[in-house]
Amino acid sequence: MDFSYNGDPVLSGINLTIREHDFIAFIGPNGGGKSTLIRLILGLIKPDKGKIRVLGERPGRHTQALGYVPQNVHINNHFPITALDVVLMGCLGTGGHFGQSRRTRKECEKEGLVTLERMGMAEHACKKIGELSGGQRQRVFIARSLMTRPRLLLLDEPTASIDSKGQRDFLKLLEALNKDVAIVVVTHDLFSVSSYVKSVACVNHGLHYHSEEEIKGQMLETMYACSVEDVCRVQVLTQVLPGAGHKHAGGADGTS
C-alpha cells in the first residue's frame, strides 16, 4: 500500500496484517507516517495504491469494530461535562442518537459505568473532565472508545501527557485489555512499552516488520550506537519482544 500527500510520498510498500489479540507498537521519527498509517486503517484517508481491509471489508463498513483515541483530544476544561458523559459519547450514532448502538440511554449508562470501573475510573464518573489529570483523561477516552465493543483499539501517543508511574499503570491496563481486543499504540518511547507490547514495527515511510528476531530496546542502542529514531533511519526491522505469544504474517496485498 502506498500513500502520498500533495504529491509527496508519505508511505510506500506497506504490508501488514493485524490479528486478534495482537499488541503492536508503531515507533519511528516524526513525519515517518505513523499517525498517517492509523488514519488509513480508520478509513479517514484513502491509499494511492493497494487496499486496506477491516474484517474483510473496506474501512468504514465496520466503524464500530474500531476504537480510536487520537493524539490530541481537545476538550474545554471549563465545559461542564462529566467523565461519564464523555464515555456515553461512544454510544452516539449519526445525528447524536443512541439508536445506532441499539442500546437505550439507560443501558448505555449502565455499560458506561461498568467500563469506567474496568478502567479504574468509576469513582470519577461524576467529576468534570477538566478536573481530571492527563492519565485519568486518557482512561476516560479509552473507555469511550470501548463503548462500541471494538475488535481493534488504535491509540496515538496515549502516554504523552502521563508521568512515568502513570505510564506504567496505564500500560498494565492496556495489557489487561489486550485479552479482549487487539491494540495498536503509536509511541516514541520504545523503552516504556517494551515490557508490555508483543511486537514493534518501525514506521519510517515504509514499515519494517520482522517476526523472528528478539531485540530489546537496549540492544538497539548497543548494536547501532544510536537512538530509536536513528535506528529507524537505517531501516532496522521490527522487533518481537520476549514474551510474545505468537508470530505474525503480513498480508500479501497490503491488507490490515
Predicted feature residues:
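Catalytic Walker B motif of ABC-type/P-loop ATPase nucleotide-binding domains
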Residues: 153-157
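The feature captures the beta-strand-to-loop junction immediately N-terminal to the Walker
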Residues: 27-29
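ABC ATPase nucleotide-binding domains
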Residues: 216-256
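Helix-to-loop junction immediately C-terminal to a conserved catalytic motif
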Residues: 42
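Conserved ABC ATPase "signature" region
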Residues: 88, 103-124
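Conserved ABC transporter NBD signature motif
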Residues: 50-66
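Conserved ABC ATPase signature
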Residues: 128-132, 136
